[in-house]
């Protein structure tokens, strides 16, 4: 893989900038936008980027910093999921606390934002508090966004519980976007000034990249990733007016800036230290780019992946047509087609060939194809059958290719497949027998105990991490679980494999 990003250069630049900004205030509330860890969007767009580089950054600051974690009450109530891990935001919040503690970072507490006495939220608070985690409620801000006098008052920010902190840098982060980090920072600063303390605010957000062009594929990829939030990149008009320099920001920050200035002046009874939304930021990610063309190409691929994902979400009823159309507009702006993702055509061709040959499942009435692009660029395909899903077949064919094992040699013994099929159909009565990818991986592990070829192939599974995968039909939960464990970047066409509304298939 060609690298487009230098983590060490970025870490040096970023830590210096945060320390410099913290030096301007007695205490700095630093809003960490995006994902604090496992930032796979950045890793996909910036080849070479460490998905956990922000944790490494915090480790360099751990003697000066502590963490407040925010989570929106509505996300807890509706069990919002992280698509890349398949876990809920509340579970991710607990995982994040564990990970931060394991790195020696102090987690001061969890702030539940826009709390409305939801039972699920109360249960979540009780669970955390019984495990020794401090939890605070913040409420919908009275008067927001028009009435600054009410916002900056005891019934506005003053109504929120104050989180007592000790370190000069307070990192305010969250499992995902829309969690109330900005409001939490301002509420904390309100309480600081009420107590006679001086505190400041800055924003650390990787995207959009302020010092890259508005139409750079990396910035467009960010917009594609946040379509559900209705984010749009734009030139920062305040920065242009103040400095005569064109920088990129996004609509929410630009729209909120006049309000921030008014709130800041009301809270501190002084002038705002920032002349633009760009001024507020401390992002140095653009300075870590070492090969612009590599980053451009990777970002173009991310835009295609996002479009394919929104098509599937629409088919599931999880998003609206506007989101699909917006994703298509972004793809068109870069002159892209879905076929520019090479595994797309390969998967479709595999399905077509299977259909012509009368292969597939249920006598050829259900035909699916899958394709994997290996790290060396080779494409390996798989087709579904009565024995296994297309994703499972493609993965097994991929590890055969990597191991130099002839295609005719079976990796999972027929007796294992037959035993699993018997259990599923005759004992568990699940109504289907073919192995999904997750089941096939277990079958491969069992076979490896007696089959040397399976043992060799199993050792190659780690080489599939980061490989591109496409399937011609919507991915089942069992295939998703396997692909996530392997670390593959997968997409699919927005079609169900059958017309059945429910078939129990995993």
Q: What spans do the regions from the language model cover?
A:
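Residues at the beta-strand->loop junction immediately N-terminal to the Walker
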Residues: 173-175
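Short HxH-centered metal-ligating active-site micro-motif
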Residues: 401-433
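Short strand->helix junction
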Residues: 177-179
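Hydrophobic positions on the alpha1 helix immediately C-terminal to the Walker A/P-loop
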Residues: 184
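Flexible phosphate-sensing "switch/lid" loops adjacent to ATP/NTP-binding sites
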Residues: 1-171, 188-354, 358, 366-367, ...
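A short, polar/charged loop-to-alpha-helix boundary motif
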Residues: 387-403
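Short clusters of small/polar residues that mark proteolytic maturation junctions
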Residues: 383-384
């Amino acid at each position: 893989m060609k690298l487009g990003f230098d983590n060490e250069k970025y870490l040096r630049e970023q830590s210096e900038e945060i320390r410099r900004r913290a030096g301007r205030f007695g205490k700095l509330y630093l809003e960490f936008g995006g994902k604090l860890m496992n930032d796979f969007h950045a890793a996909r767009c910036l080849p070479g980027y460490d998905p956990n580089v922000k944790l490494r950054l915090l480790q360099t600051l751990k003697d000066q910093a502590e963490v407040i974690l925010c989570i929106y009450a509505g996300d807890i109530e509706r069990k919002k999921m992280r698509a890349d891990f398949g876990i809920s935001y509340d579970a991710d919040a607990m995982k994040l606390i564990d990970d931060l503690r394991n790195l020696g970072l102090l987690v001061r507490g969890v702030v539940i934002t826009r709390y409305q006495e939801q039972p699920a939220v109360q249960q979540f608070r009780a669970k955390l508090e019984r495990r020794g985690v401090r939890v605070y409620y913040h409420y919908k801000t009275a008067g927001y966004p028009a009435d600054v006098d009410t916002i900056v008052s005891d019934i506005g920010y003053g109504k929120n519980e104050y989180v007592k902190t000790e370190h000069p840098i307070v990192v305010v982060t969250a499992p995902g976007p829309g969690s109330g980090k900005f409001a939490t920072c301002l509420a904390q600063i309100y309480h600081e000034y009420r107590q006679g303390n001086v505190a400041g605010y800055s924003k650390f957000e990787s995207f959009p990249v302020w010092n890259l062009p508005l139409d750079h594929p990396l910035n467009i990829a960010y917009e594609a990733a946040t379509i559900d939030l209705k984010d749009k990149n734009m030139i920062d008009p305040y920065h242009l007016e103040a400095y005569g320099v064109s920088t990129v920001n996004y609509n929410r920050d630009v729209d909120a800036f006049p309000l921030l200035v008014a709130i800041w002046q009301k809270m501190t009874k002084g002038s705002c230290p920032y002349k633009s939304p760009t001024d507020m930021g401390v992002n140095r990610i653009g300075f870590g780019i070492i090969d612009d063309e590599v980053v451009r190409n990777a970002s173009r691929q991310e835009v295609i992946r996002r479009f394919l994902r929104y098509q599937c979400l629409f088919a599931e009823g999880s998003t609206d047509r506007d989101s699909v159309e917006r994703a298509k507009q972004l793809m068109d702006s870069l002159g892209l087609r879905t076929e520019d993702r090479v595994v797309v055509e390969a998967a479709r061709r595999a399905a077509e060939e299977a259909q012509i040959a009368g292969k597939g499942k249920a006598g050829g009435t259900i035909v699916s194809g899958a394709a994997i692009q290996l790290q060396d660029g080779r494409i390996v395909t798989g087709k579904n059958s009565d024995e296994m899903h297309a994703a499972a077949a493609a993965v097994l064919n991929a590890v055969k290719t990597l191991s130099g094992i002839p295609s005719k040699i079976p990796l999972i013994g027929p007796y294992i497949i037959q035993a699993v099929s018997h259990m599923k159909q005759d004992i568990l009565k699940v109504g289907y027998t073919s192995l999904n990818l997750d089941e096939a991986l277990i079958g491969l592990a069992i076979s490896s105990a007696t089959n040397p070829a399976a043992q060799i192939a199993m050792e190659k599974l780690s080489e599939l991490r980061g490989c591109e995968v496409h399937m011609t039909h919507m991915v089942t939960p069992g295939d998703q679980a396997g692909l996530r464990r392997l670390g593959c970047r997968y997409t699919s066409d927005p079609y169900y494999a059958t017309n059945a509304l429910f078939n129990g298939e995993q």
